[in-house]
């Protein structure tokens, strides 16, 4: 390979790390303004025995800092001698390991010449990969004794470079930076961090690179102190008491003004006395009719004064108010009621009547003791609540209480509010607020933002959204006025700005979405607005500019917080346009979160060491610390423990000395000082001035067909397109029920000239459908955005569809109404296809290519405006499930029979058509040739790979009998695949054992970004599969790494530590895929096995257990041999068979990969390795409760049979064994290998086995409508259902298997299992139970599986009640929720 090719391969798709900068990147010349800051590094002037290469030491520090401030583990740097360093950094490395890695990389680079410029290389890559733009290969640099310019390269503009100058017998570090991006203050902090990090690393090189503090002396005072007293005992009183005091002090002052509707020219104005009196009446009614302190009262509300009256009435009664918006569908309203479980209900007259569905739910499910059916305040200040049967108003008897306080005492920890935030599976979480927070911050805010009793506030927040509390309580605290617009004022573009101007509003609370509504198509200025407080979502510069164009005196305050932090938020203030016209120009696109308000801290915590606060620029997770946090989630104690945590920086009772009992009447409702943090799940970093900026979600990821995708990242890139105004990317199910990325966006209508270039005519007949209209009218814009994104996103992160809309729908809370944004229906997509002018040049295609193109377009979810012969099926929106449909449609329409793997081998139109041409011209079938070729490859490949094995392996001896020795010895077991189905049970089996003189510690391999994330994955898998026990945690050590890499990518030191610790290796991890060819499975299933096995070649001797699969036997030879042996009275295929008779003939890539791995392991056994190959068949649900991996062939067959109503008459026996027994065999053979002097095989077979037909017909026994059909008839029924009628069926992804001679493919040879029996017999000494007789799957066991599938929603309930009742099983709610959400739909179990 030439040097040029080496560099091209090395620099494929590099990560261009961006050091956090202070100013926007210039979009036009000049792009750079070079500046330099220099500092002495005396630490490097003295010799260090361990670090001979001083340049590598300093480079290591720079790499560590880059990782800490960007989170990028792919480090790419331009370095000395015209080279580019690229390596993966690990957060668990010590500085020694980092230095060693970099030093080794530098030595390797010395042998690779770069006798060309990297500009030339980038142009070569552009040409080779046919890129539209020359790729940038690096953005950061670290040099030595080099005079460097940031714009030295044509295609690689450098942001920040460090140059180590050793020319004067001293070490001077020059920081060369673009001052158009970075402030002097930022650069000084980076220099201080570098110096501090270098000192710490050299003083103790064993320090973990992610745990060396980045808080410097110069920046410490800018950052929050997590041990500071935040006024835990400073309760200022309850908001309703403060309001009553105000009402008595100035009763005639205007409190609420409802502005007139279209049919009226008169406002409705109410005084503080009016609101106080009417709310007193409501409060006394609630109390007298049974509402107790702490009861929840639900308010069915409209926007207006009535809501204020109801809220105050509920609070005065000592109760908790919650609000339902009538805009929500009735079914959704019942969900909120189910979470809240109210004891009281108030219906505001203006909100209308409750839907009958809601009334039925209230009557059937709730225990309502107090109800007001039609509350409305009259213009004269009196209150009505609805008529009784005698004609009297329900509230009339309580009118005499209008000037009487209730006397109900509540305290700082009483719960005045129940607000809702999103939850899993569409079930909202109810957040209980605290009285401490409601009024605590208003006094500070009035001083900080100059808010007074003369201000006019607005009621613009969603009425069921917690910011509505700010709208109401802020003016009530101050004695100010609240103005209420009509729905027409809010909903008519441009009208809300006119309303703000007409009524002279001075202060408003907005969400960014409501702010966009305020400014959309608005021309009327509202200069009296002096403050706009934004909450609820990210606030962009564009949002601020639009608002200040109309409100030039408005200071904009971005407030960061959540429903869970209640009023405890941070703030960042944008100066008004009049105060500083250029203020926004200096800021980046997204407004920072700023600093905490009075006694509120945003703690950005080191993700690898939570005892550390992050330094300036370092990415961490944001925790909010304050005395004003909400109480927690209603009825979710486990989630409360996870999200509301005690401050670990101080002792739990540290602040108790501050709590002075002065006989306050509320003291019984006070839990004392509680220093708590709310874990937001947001990532953030500190700016040089101590402000905080958000960097996305720690969990803002989705998984599409195995790829982890950040939705926030996609939206950020799309928002940078010059014609995009608003955008949101979501995951939606398409017509095939496949999760699909789809972007909804609003274009820049204020740029009509630019936009017109991308507009197309829309036929009148489809103009009324906004989705169809957008897809047709702006398909050129969508194409341009996709082109724009190709340069910025990986192909799998590209939205499958971009829908252009006139506006994004908002929910009543002023946020984007995501449920209304759904994947277009097939009818809509067909209309788009019929009415879009194709830009495809037919002359580019041959006849067969044209047929292939048209066939693909007929089954793809979206129809691209242009297609070329070089377009890939997958680039056009295809995936493995659609590939199944495509292959069957091909067979039906073109009479060409191709195996499914063909599309993976020939993915473009041109290549796929050429393969069809070849098959037709040869008159043969592709399948035979492909199989023959691949068959030869896997066996030959395995033989070649054996040559890479060590010449010998140390042989381990058996463990001492578990009950024969004194003392306790720890057995250390390294296990792969622990987050999969079988792996989860292996882990549980190991850690559930308690032999007398042994304990177990599991070294669990998990792929994740860090140990915390890895453990979370492992724990989630355990909960999902029903195996997790909290006691396991202390006996688990997570091992990070990539099994496909030598030494898993670990340093030599860590590798040897592991090798010298581990006693047993259980290699269970594998990629299970029924379509992928051997080539795609070679790395995860074969190479990884060699790498795991290499752990047994060094250090202490180990047993090696490998989980294989009976798919290694799936050849005609073994089917015939099995029949022969059984006819002779023998049990079946011997465990001693060397499998050389399936060295050819295996047709599936998965079985081939397992065969190759087994072959290599047996050869290692000949060289001394001891242990066992465990060969299970179908690994099925847990025997006790059916816990299963729902993405399973046999379970899909159950569901598909229910959906079709038919089952095939197939008499084959099925080798099914419950997962807990398979795990038992794996662990038993790992502790007690069957053979002492050789590496043997243990086959897992069911005792008894069940016939395939009987397995499926169990559905009938438990009340499902299924009938038996011959396989040929059943096949036609399924094909007609799925292919012809497009009906949903769980077997859809497996059509290639179930419609292709299923009676043959479900054959399972009978197996000898004497080795498994021997190990289980020996295992009796370890477990106290003899399992050597084995277990299988009976009809009764299938009943348990059906019960499980019912409980998690995978199967519908049985249709007949006169059959067997489903068995009773026990599952935790957490497991049900996870499985129902799809968490159990994939597993890494090696067994098929």
UniProtKB/Swiss-Prot annotation:
Cofactor note (record): Binds 1 phosphopantetheine covalently.
GO cellular component, alphabetical, reads: cytoplasm
Q: In which pathway does it act?
A: Amino-acid biosynthesis; L-lysine biosynthesis via AAA pathway; L-lysine from L-alpha-aminoadipate (fungal route): step 1/3
Cofactor(s) annotated in UniProt: pantetheine 4'-phosphate
Task: List the Gene3D superfamilies hit by this protein, alphabetically.
Answer: 3.30.300.30, ACP-like, N-terminal domain of ligase-like, NAD(P)-binding Rossmann-like Domain, Nonribosomal peptide synthetase, condensation domain
**Which part of the chain is the Carrier domain?**
843-920
GO terms (molecular function) for this protein are:
L-aminoadipate-semialdehyde dehydrogenase activity; phosphopantetheine binding
Q: One Pfam family name from the record?
A: NAD_binding_4
Q: Which reaction does it catalyse?
A: (S)-2-amino-6-oxohexanoate + NADP(+) + H2O = L-2-aminoadipate + NADPH + 2 H(+); (S)-2-amino-6-oxohexanoate + NAD(+) + H2O = L-2-aminoadipate + NADH + 2 H(+); (S)-2-amino-6-oxohexanoate + AMP + diphosphate + NADP(+) = L-2-aminoadipate + ATP + NADPH + H(+)
Keyword terms, alphabetized:
Amino-acid biosynthesis, Isopeptide bond, Lysine biosynthesis, NADP, Oxidoreductase, Phosphopantetheine, Phosphoprotein, Ubl conjugation
Which GO biological process categories is it annotated with?
lysine biosynthetic process via aminoadipic acid
- Cross-linked residues for Glycyl lysine isopeptide (Lys-Gly) (interchain with G-Cter in ubiquitin) are 541, 1276
Q: Which domain of life is it from?
A: Eukaryota
**By its UniProt entry, which InterPro entries does this protein fall under?**
AA_adenyl_dom, ACP-like_sf, AMP-bd_C_sf, AMP-binding_CS, AMP-dep_synth/lig_dom, ANL_N_sf, Far_NAD-bd, Lys2
Q: What is its EC number?
A: 1.2.1.31, 1.2.1.95
In the record, O-(pantetheine 4'-phosphoryl)serine modifications are located at: 880
What does the record give as the function of this protein?
Catalyzes the activation of alpha-aminoadipate by ATP-dependent adenylation and the reduction of activated alpha-aminoadipate by NADPH. The activated alpha-aminoadipate is bound to the phosphopantheinyl group of the enzyme itself before it is reduced to (S)-2-amino-6-oxohexanoate.
The record makes one more remark, namely: Present with 7430 molecules/cell in log phase SD medium.
Task: Family membership, please give it.
Answer: Belongs to the ATP-dependent AMP-binding enzyme family.
Q: What is this protein's record name?
A: L-2-aminoadipate reductase
Give the originating organism: Saccharomyces cerevisiae (strain ATCC 204508 / S288c) (Baker's yeast)
Q: Which gene encodes it?
A: LYS2
